[in-house]
Amino acid sequence: MEAQSHSSTTTEKKKVENSIVKCSTRTDVSEKAVASSTTSNEDESPGQTYHRERRNAITMQPQNVQGLSKVSEEPSTSSDERASLIKKEIHGSLPHVAEPSVPYRGTVFAMDPRNGYMEPHYHPPHLFPAFHPPVPIDARHHEGRYHYDPSPIPPLHMTSALSSSPTYPDLPFIRISPHRNPAAASESPFSPPHPYINPYMDYIRSLHSSPSLSMISATRGLSPTDAPHAGVSPAEYYHQMALLTGQRSPYADIIPSAATAGTGAIHMEYLHAMDSTRFPSPRLSARPSRKRTLSISPLSDHSFDLQTMIRTSPNSLVTILNNSRSSSSASGSYGHLSASAISPALSFTYSSAPVSLHMHQQILSRQQSLGSAFGHSPPLIHPAPTFPTQRPIPGIPTVLNPVQVSSGPSESSQNKPTSESAVSSTGDPMHNKRSKIKPDEDLPSPGARGQQEQPEGTTLVKEEGDKDESKQEPEVIYETNCHWEGCAREFDTQEQLVHHINNDHIHGEKKEFVCRWLDCSREQKPFKAQYMLVVHMRRHTGEKPHKCTFEGCTKAYSRLENLKTHLRSHTGEKPYVCEHEGCNKAFSNASDRAKHQNRTHSNEKPYVCKIPGCTKRYTDPSSLRKHVKTVHGPEAHVTKKQRGDIHPRPPPPRDSGSHSQSRSPGRPTQGALGEQQDLSNTTSKREECLQVKTVKAEKPMTSQPSPGGQSSCSSQQSPISNYSNSGLELPLTDGGSIGDLSAIDETPIMDSTISTATTALALQARRNPAGTKWMEHVKLERLKQVNGMFPRLNPILPPKAPAVSPLIGNGTQSNNTCSLGGPMTLLPGRSDLSGVDVTMLNMLNRRDSSASTISSAYLSSRRSSGISPCFSSRRSSEASQAEGRPQNVSVADSYDPISTDASRRSSEASQSDGLPSLLSLTPAQQYRLKAKYAAATGGPPPTPLPNMERMSLKTRLALLGDALEPGVALPPVHAPRRCSDGGAHGYGRRHLQPHDAPGHGVRRASDPVRTGSEGLALPRVPRFSSLSSCNPPAMATSAEKRSLVLQNYTRPEGGQSRNFHSSPCPPSITENVTLESLTMDADANLNDEDFLPDDVVQYLNSQNQAGYEQHFPSTLPDDSKVPHGPGDFDAPGLPDSHAGQQFHALEQPCPEGSKTDLPIQWNEVSSGSADLSSSKLKCGPRPAVPQTRAFGFCNGMVVHPQNPLRSGPAGGYQTLGENSNPYGGPEHLMLHNSPGSGTSGNAFHEQPCKAPQYGNCLNRQPVAPGALDGACGAGIQASKLKSTPMQGSGGQLNFGLPVAPNESAGSMVNGMQNQDPVGQGYLAHQLLGDSMQHPGAGRPGQQMLGQISATSHINIYQGPESCLPGAHGMGSQPSSLAVVRGYQPCASFGGSRRQAMPRDSLALQSGQLSDTSQTCRVNGIKMEMKGQPHPLCSNLQNYSGQFYDQTVGFSQQDTKAGSFSISDASCLLQGTSAKNSELLSPGANQVTSTVDSLDSHDLEGVQIDFDAIIDDGDHSSLMSGALSPSIIQNLSYSSSRLTTPRASLPFPALSMSTTNMAIGDMSSLLTSLAEESKFLAVMQ
């Protein structure tokens, strides 16, 4: 070896001398030396053997001497004597040690690195300089060139043993001034054998701790004062550093000699200790868990002057790069060189041992650069965490290929796994790779492609707007003629053409960014931004404005990212490290890494040629592109068509890290062309396929294998990350508004904080089996990994589930669409969506990020809130008010400050998008989802809901997914809905919520409570006067109403006629027709459970069940007693049939024991469980709050039961009606004011709420159990009631309609319609709907849809404030959502669009409660929905004063059929009596996790009505904080924070007993907290 090394040394010496001497001046020499290492100066001295990039220096260094012979390895100029001396000392360990006299590389000249002169012209600095002056910088530095001494450190010739020793490669060697005695190189200048114990170490320490010390200068030898020792020139200093192992320098003891290296017996413990304890410098630690590898590209370096570097590029990288992470390990570097310990110019030509030294140098440069960036890089050696048995560094070839040895900048060096490639640009290769899993790894994970362009031009050119434009640079084109459509101008130069196009065509058509170039493959598909078009045009003109600024390099690129990739060839940066365990190879671009990984570590060929008939598959995207280009023609490459417009391809199969190996077999086929898969492209979103990228495109998180793979905060790779694409891919229509989300090049769509799992899922917009499979596959894989991390999703989507129909720009829904957010609409049919889908969609809902809720891929960031493991996003509030979120937010979540599922500002859910997000899902639903998910994935079962033991069997079964009514889950998606339609549930139109009313803007829960505005409120009517005095405008016939409702004609802006329930936008004619027919045909069965917050459902169920069953039978008059005929009850102008129904309940005597009095703790409320026992609810005195809510919500429309029962713990509540008639009195049932009804007949008796009216008296009116029952029971056949106008003013609603499930006539709806063609349009049937079926869940025969068992007249108070709190909810129907669930049933009365009416009520409402005269459609949902019982849930959801569209909650069936059995009605909620009855919201002290009563159906059928969501705006912004504002509003007049529903309706004051709402109740909070903890545990 020695002989060889000597010979090589001689040869190299000659070569080096030649190369250096070629320069005319010393300065040139120094410059050239520098340039040779830093910039390739092939142009000036093509003959030089080493043109290399900073890191390529390593690549240039062959492993063996023979290889070196070709490389100019500067022999040490030191005399052989010296070398021999050293050899003796080190026992021959360093055969080629250069003489100390020429400290640097043994070039013939010992040049001073500072001035290029042969002799150091600066006096050596003091032995221990107080500080190192800054590195002198001259213009050349600004020019991007460093001028290092060409005669730097002599090559560190180490024995092969040393080279193979893992210690070297693993140790980041740090140069420290040896302070050696110049006279005796062999002797340690310090007497102590272990200098680290000595002042010297103190000095070192000072270096570490002293930022003032310019480590950059120290590392580079740039600073004249850096010479560490008086007798030592900087060159010597570095030389000695290099020789530390051989000399008795302070580190001689630490650094293993050849012998020790050979044995590998080096004790690094000391170093470790030193490293970790003494030198807390910022250098990279061995810890593999750092952030992802950051490109150390100078471009990414904040200290790098891009503008100077890219002098010629019109589009300087500065703006981009300055903003890029400056934390790259090279952050301290001046230019493309990181402030590495040894200047690249000092490139060592190493002999056989060089590999280790290379590693050493690179490590130094990497780590030190890291430290030096801070101005104080630890000079100490950084021990490798472990030293494997001696073995060559894995990534480094033992011998360099000639190509590699040859000119450095050659890009081949990049592509080849050169020795240097082993070293990642940042950090130890070993650690680097492990610690920084770049999502952009080889596979084109979204961020990756952008960076990893192939230097050649094959680099992926990610077209911001379209992946079509593969990243590869276009063929050399020099177009001078304009081929723009209609333009044939010719120019002399390309520049002129470009100018013409930009000014005349692009800027001239500012409104539309379309390429009209003839034969453009984009086919005039518009770009989302002008800059995209500008970049795109370069494909046609051949313009390549981005030129490489390194001297001698003539490369130019049309895309900046390609230039950046290319620059890596000069800088040697290789940010893409092989993710295979034990492989340290690093690559400058992801494609090369992909190639390496797929070829070396697997046989996978994920990149499949998409050209029809071609079956070629490749290991990397660049090969695929090359194939496509050469075989199929330049135009064939990666076009969207290839990618398959049919449905977005799943992200390239390649997933980072270990996943890369684990890719599912199916993935490869799915892998798109590298380019296509270019998911890695930051902007790689195709126009059509919106990829919501969750991570910074530029540099995906290290930890996350793929951008979507892991949240930045998670060190684990997200299970979903396998799909690098990680993001939603939603097909957008051409101009899809959402496409913009990720359209911007280099603009990460989502924060790295995105949930780990979140990103990976991509919904396949197009319904495509492949997509579905992909989704299934992804989910399965992810689920396996993620069990417990987030709510369990069904791993396998229903066949169509993943399909998201193309997003429609305007947001209209085609087919069955769920509007996802903004303009996008998901079109999956009801059958398509499964709980999983819903969950996913909900999660999509999560974040408001860029343009729509869609932005978060599929789960909200887990970071979002400590307690909301999966849902809320950090920016929870943004979304929260964003879209018309009337929907199903689980009240509990919304207002439970500690809700388990949501953070207090439960991300959007709080105000809730219409999507039934998990937040929206009731606890039961969530529970069920989890259970299903666990079952599917084999994970542990979810934590049982707190009240499970109390739940009815049915509820339990439902939770377990054995729902009795599997079909009754979500409204059929196919039920047509227009944006104009309100009502998430069943897609019925939603009631206007106060905030929906004109003039009501979005309002945060924190905003002061606003009472319903006049506009929303029904026209004021004297409270105590009879209804007839109100003289509301006559209602249109039911048919008319229906049509009007559909058309929203019923909702004139002004006055009384405003139909609050109608959706804000008038439906189109076609919509009317279609909706009408579809709604009538809709067969989805909805349970209240589906929409009402779990808590509410539970509460309602419990109420209904107990009260209903207990009292209903007893209190309900026999059918004979109760008028079944439509004529039985007339509720003149009864705004809400609902009221009537509920009134019954009010009237029903409530058992003394009922909890009606119980204050609804806010927690309870939040849980959705006012813990009234079902019986209590059923009991007459229904908690006013809920009832009131139900009733009172109607803005000012208070339906006061004429005779609210005072019986029961009425004391606490005000009886809704002053006169309480037994439930049985049909007359009371009759809402009509007829004097006979026991209250002043027509007068709207505002049953004086005993409690102060909160606008709406929240007075908890005792609700007659029967009434409640009725309400629930009346799952109203409201469907039939549907648009039946209640008899208008004076018209008496006949609630008595028997609710025979199938009785159309009997159905309240029909009856209502029939009876009161003109009726107020108040859906008496709403009342009915709620109460109609009160006859008992089990008693279909008794179901009286419209039948309000209670005879009490419900006085509908039109005064906006008069909404009886209980009137609605309290109303006679125990099971009425209004009463039970919908605390807001009244809401339906109220103008608020979202009425919390029971779904049944909804039916009623939709029947048309016009505020005044107009039919107020609850949610505008046609109650017609096929006899699906609408769970009251949706209505109830509106606890807070928010009215939900959900009022529409009627099961469409219910409403339509109106025939659903009472049991259905009763159960409407979630099988109200059965499922949820036991799910009472936990008692005051019990908090039901919102997840608690997740109804399996609810999830399953959950259709997310995106339109509604969008439409509604922030209807239901439940208080993000705690209780649903509505509920609380009146609970605590003063506590607006809790009660500030956006649409805060006045609530009747609660009686003290109820007002005891434990809004601040600690026990409730604690309970809630405990539940949350449980929930989180489950989630995790």
Swiss-Prot record:
Keyword Transcription listed: yes
Post-translational modification: Phosphorylated on multiple sites by protein kinase A (PKA) and phosphorylation by PKA primes further phosphorylation by CK1 and GSK3. Phosphorylated by DYRK2 (in vitro). Phosphorylation is essential for its proteolytic processing. Transcriptional repressor GLI3R, a C-terminally truncated form, is generated from the full-length GLI3 protein (GLI3FL/GLI3-190) through proteolytic processing. This process requires PKA-primed phosphorylation of GLI3, ubiquitination of GLI3 and the presence of BTRC. GLI3FL is complexed with SUFU in the cytoplasm and is maintained in a neutral state. Without the Hh signal, the SUFU-GLI3 complex is recruited to cilia, leading to the efficient processing of GLI3FL into GLI3R.
Keyword annotations from UniProtKB, A to Z: Acetylation, Activator, Cell projection, Cilium, Cytoplasm, DNA-binding, Isopeptide bond, Metal-binding, Methylation, Nucleus, Phosphoprotein, Repeat, Repressor, Transcription, Transcription regulation, Ubl conjugation, Zinc, Zinc-finger
Biased composition regions of type Basic and acidic residues, renumbered to the chain: 461-474, 632-648, 684-699
Entry-annotated residues carrying Omega-N-methylarginine: 175
Segments traversing the membrane: none
Region Disordered, annotated ranges: 1-79, 368-475, 620-728, 863-918, 981-1042
Positions of modified residues (N-acetylmethionine): 1
Zinc finger feature spans (C2H2-type): 480-505, 513-540, 546-570, 576-601, 607-632
SMART domains: ZnF_C2H2 (SM00355)
Subcellular location(s) per record: Nucleus; Cytoplasm; Cell projection, Cilium
Crosslink (Glycyl lysine isopeptide (Lys-Gly) (interchain with G-Cter in SUMO2)) position: 438, 462, 779
Biased composition (Low complexity): 703-726, 863-882
GO annotation (BP), single: smoothened signaling pathway
Annotated spans, Mediates interaction with DZIP1: 745-845
Source organism superkingdom: Eukaryota
Record cross-link Glycyl lysine isopeptide (Lys-Gly) (interchain with G-Cter in ubiquitin), residues: 773, 779, 784, 800
InterPro entries, per database record: GLI-like, Znf-C2H2_ZIC1-5/GLI1-3-like, Znf_C2H2_sf, Znf_C2H2_type
Phosphoserine PTM positions: 664, 849, 865, 877, 907, 980, 1006
GO molecular function, one term: DNA-binding transcription factor activity
Entry's family note: Belongs to the GLI C2H2-type zinc-finger protein family.
Assembly and interaction partners: The full-length GLI3 form (GLI3FL) interacts with SUFU and this interaction regulates the formation of either repressor or activator forms of GLI3. Its association with SUFU is regulated by Hh signaling and dissociation of the SUFU-GLI3 interaction requires the presence of the ciliary motor KIF3A. Interacts with KIF7. The activator form of GLI3 (GLI3A) but not the repressor form (GLI3R) can interact with TRPS1. The phosphorylated form interacts with BTRC. Interacts with ZIC1. Interacts with ZIC3 (via C2H2-type domains 3, 4 and 5); the interaction enhances its transcriptional activity.
Role of this protein: Has a dual function as a transcriptional activator and a repressor of the sonic hedgehog (Shh) pathway, and plays a role in limb development. The full-length GLI3 form (GLI3FL) after phosphorylation and nuclear translocation, acts as an activator (GLI3A) while GLI3R, its C-terminally truncated form, acts as a repressor. A proper balance between the GLI3 activator and the repressor GLI3R, rather than the repressor gradient itself or the activator/repressor ratio gradient, specifies limb digit number and identity.
The protein, known as: Transcriptional activator GLI3
Source taxonomy: Eukaryota, Metazoa, Chordata, Craniata, Vertebrata
Gene: GLI3
